[in-house]
Amino acid sequence: MRHKLMTSTIASLMFVAAAAVAADPTPVSVVGGTIHFEGKLVNAACAVSTKSADQTVTLGQYRTASFTAIGNTTAQVPFSIVLNDCDPKVAATAAVAFSGQADNTTPNLLAVSSADNSTTATGVGIEILDNTSSPLKPDGATFSAKQSLVEGTNTLRFTARYKATAAATTPGQANADATFIMKYE
């Protein structure tokens, strides 16, 4: 009997102790990281969509044998810049200029480079064209054809392609970066 009483007392104390531990956990706080918030308020006719602000246009892979003369080009690859919340009463049109490192031999093209330590292709640059197929020099001052704005969302369409700057090309990475400037009138 005494053994049962001791066993039941020990069991009761264990339940009370377990409940006390479970009911009163000590909170722990630790720094988890940093979140960067970026944005901009603009006094303009439209706001550039966040999906258009930073984008990658994949031009593809081409054989060097495809470029046999200066001026040879690859297929045009479409891309667009989406404008949101447009108010055509503020400005009736929008145009875009691109700015980037110009090719040394053909300054109306973007110079190509490699993002890492890999070999950079030579004899080729990247050409950007507007919706009228007019080439846009990457000088930040050559604007695309004006597009009339409608209220709400507007899409400005462009294409890009590789263009030979020499009669012979060499293989390697052929990447370029360009920023774009909006002009509303």
Curated annotation (Swiss-Prot):
One biological process term from GO is:
cell adhesion involved in single-species biofilm formation
- Keyword list, A-Z: Disulfide bond, Fimbrium, Signal
- Primary location class: other
- Subcellular location field: Fimbrium
Disulfide bond recorded as keyword:
yes
Superkingdom, taxonomy of origin: Bacteria
Q: Where are the transmembrane segments?
A: none
Which InterPro entries does the protein's record reference?
Adhesion_dom_fimbrial, Adhesion_dom_fimbrial_sf, Adhesion_dom_sf, Bact_Fimbrial_Adh_Pro
Identify one Pfam family in the record: Fimbrial
Range of residues in the leader sequence: 1-22
Spell out the disulfide connections: 46-86
| CC terms in the record's Gene Ontology section | pilus
Family stated for the protein in its record = Belongs to the fimbrial protein family.
**What is the name listed in the Swiss-Prot or TrEMBL entry for this protein?**
Fimbrial subunit type 1
User: What organism, scientifically named, is this protein from?
Assistant: Salmonella typhimurium
